[in-house]
C-alpha cells in the first residue's frame, strides 16, 4: 500500500537560504526514522489537503453507514444532491460537473463495464469479433471473453484513464460476473477471479480505487482485492449477508433497492452497515435514501 502524504503541514514555508540536500549515505540512515515519525504523527495535526484529481479515493474505515450516496447514469447530472459519494457514467459526465462536485468535497466514482460492451460505446470497435459474446439482459450490450486479457487490458486502461482525467478517484467495475451467465464463452469461476483481480490491479496502477459491483458469489474471495462494493437488491434477493466480508473489513458497501420502501429495507441494510437507498431502475437523479443511524 502506498501512503500519500501532504507536501507540508501548517503554514507557508519560511523564506531564507535553502537547506543543503543531505548526502546519499545520510539520507539512507535517516529514512527509517522519518518513516517511523510519519506513522506516529497524528493525521489531525495537519491541515486537510484536497485530494488531487489523480489520487485514489480514500475510504475512512467504518464510515459508510454514515454516508449518503448517489448513483446516476441517466439524465443531466444533479450536482446539488446532498450526498457524500457520487457514482456516475464517465463518458456522459463532463469535466465541469466533476469539478463542481469536487469543489463541494464529494467523492467521485466512475462506473466502467469491464466484462461487457455496448454497441453505442465510443470504443466498441476496439473489441474484435473473437472476444464478443452473446447479449446480456440489457439492450445492445454483449458479454466479453474475459480470458483474453491481452485484448481487453489496453481498452480498459483507456477507460480508466478517462475516469482519472475527469477527476474521478475510484472506479466501480460492472459486469464482472460473466462466468455466472450465458456469455457465449466457457468461462469458469477461476477465470473470472483471475480477470477481476487483474482489473483491480490495473485500476490501482492508474491511481483509481477499485470497487466490485454485485458478483456476490465471489465476494468472499475478492474482498481483499477491492476497496468497496456496490450492490443491487440484496434485500429482495435475500443475499445481503454475502457482503459481510466487506463490512467486516471496514470497507464501504453502497447498496440500492428498486422495489419496496425504505421503511421496510433500511432496518436490514443499515443494520449491516451499508450506505443504502431506493432508486428507480433507470438510475436517474431521483433517490430515496435511508436515514442515517
Question: Positions of the model-derived regions?
Answer:
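Glycan-processing catalytic domains of CAZymes
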Residues: 50-293
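Interdomain coupling and dimerization elements in large ATP-driven molecular machines
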Residues: 13-15
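Secretory targeting and sorting signals
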Residues: 1-7, 17, 22-50
